[in-house]
């Protein structure tokens, strides 16, 4: 079954929506963005999630100590690194997280896909998952742009945990899942109306993913 991550949650009603439709992951943005949440708000929202929905914190070029502090304070399950973090940064972050929490925290690394060569960096990292997003000049993600899914499909064929992001929405996600066969899909703006999460779009998105998997929404 393809996992679903609904990203950019910032309101209590957003949590109500994901608790109703039950994606596997819920994302909270701590980088500069209109969807950015404070650690206090994130802690409240994470606590309101159903226990089976894992929380993911999105960080861009943040200090390791700050990431670890936020993870401990909010109770996050996963860290998504969406900037220019290096393999050395990842290893040091793992060590730091291991010292401050008994829970194993997953680490995901985002890769901004421009061409085939931009994917070569994957071999340098030891992380739990890679999130493939479209390369957009001057942006670290969340731009709603689509990239060549064939590039993602080629990577997904050789990696168990590839998460597809970038311009996904209820209209195109079924085709994307069928073509790429990723471990998971990630959506933010594609399930929003006027800049806020839309319950019907979240439902439709997850339903289309399940259709691609050959099943139906439970």
From Swiss-Prot:
This is N-(5'-phosphoribosyl)anthranilate isomerase. GO terms for biological process: L-tryptophan biosynthetic process. Belongs to the TrpF family. The keyword Isomerase applies. It catalyses: N-(5-phospho-beta-D-ribosyl)anthranilate = 1-(2-carboxyphenylamino)-1-deoxy-D-ribulose 5-phosphate. It comes from Acetivibrio thermocellus (strain ATCC 27405 / DSM 1237 / JCM 9322 / NBRC 103400 / NCIMB 10682 / NRRL B-4536 / VPI 7372) (Clostridium thermocellum). GO terms for molecular function: phosphoribosylanthranilate isomerase activity. InterPro entries: Aldolase_TIM, PRAI_dom, RibuloseP-bd_barrel, TrpF_fam. Pfam families: PRAI. Its EC number is 5.3.1.24. Pathway: Amino-acid biosynthesis; L-tryptophan biosynthesis; L-tryptophan from chorismate: step 3/5. Coiled coil: none annotated. The keyword Kinase does not apply. PANTHER family: N-(5'-PHOSPHORIBOSYL)ANTHRANILATE ISOMERASE (PTHR42894:SF1). Keywords: Amino-acid biosynthesis, Aromatic amino acid biosynthesis, Isomerase, Tryptophan biosynthesis.
């Amino acid at each position: 079954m393809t996992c679903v991550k609904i990203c950019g949650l910032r309101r209590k009603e957003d949590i109500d929506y994901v608790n109703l439709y039950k994606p596997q992951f819920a994302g909270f943005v701590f980088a500069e963005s209109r969807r950015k949440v404070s650690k206090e708000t994130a802690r409240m929202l994470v606590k309101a999630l159903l226990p089976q929905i894992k929380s993911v914190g999105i960080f861009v070029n943040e200090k390791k100590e700050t990431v670890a502090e936020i993870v401990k304070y909010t109770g996050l399950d996963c860290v998504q690194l969406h900037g220019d973090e290096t393999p050395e940064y990842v290893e040091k972050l793992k060590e730091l997280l291991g010292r401050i929490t008994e829970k194993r925290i997953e680490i995901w690394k985002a890769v901004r896909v421009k061409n085939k060569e931009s994917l070569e960096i994957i071999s340098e990292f030891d992380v739990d998952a890679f999130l493939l997003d479209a390369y957009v000049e001057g942006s670290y993600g969340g731009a709603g742009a689509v990239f060549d899914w064939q590039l993602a499909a080629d990577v997904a064929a050789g990696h168990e945990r590839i998460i597809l992001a970038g311009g996904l929405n209820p209209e195109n996600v079924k085709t994307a899942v069928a073509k790429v066969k990723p471990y998971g899909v990630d959506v933010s703006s594609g399930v929003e109306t006027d800049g806020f999460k839309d319950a019907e779009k979240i439902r439709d998105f997850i339903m289309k993913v399940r259709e691609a998997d050959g099943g139906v929404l439970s």
